[in-house]
Amino acid sequence: MAVTLTPTLTLTSSDITADALSISVTDSLSLGSNDARITRQISPNDVDPGGTQIFDTNLGKSYIYAKNTHATLTIYLAAAADTATGASWMALAPGEFAFFPWAGVVDLFAHSGANGQGVATAGLEYIVFEA
């Protein structure tokens, strides 16, 4: 049985430009009959080579929600087991989140950088919706 996920993004501001900003977009995403929904809260660190793997290519095309729940550390997302922050595709500061499509052709890792600041408490909440 196919299921549907409906993401909505709204951006508003009254002072970022001379004109008021008000953008809202919605989509309807079909997840398919064999979809996997993986929900976890993890402590990504720099001890494991490349951090913690949060997505494996065997899932195929997916939609990923990720939120940095750590109070002080930035969480980096990268498609390779590499804790160099310059190799990261995304950096989520404390409280920041992202929802994005993932082609599923490479793995996805989360880490807190190569500076020895492993996250001792949960720092990344993520959900993978397989398309």
Which residue stretches match the model-derived regions?
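N-terminal low-complexity, intrinsically disordered "leader/linker" segments enriched in small/polar
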Residues: 1-54
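Buried hydrophobic-core signal for structured, non-transmembrane domains
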Residues: 61-67, 108, 125
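Short, flexible beta-strand-to-coil junctions
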Residues: 66-72, 112-114, 129-131
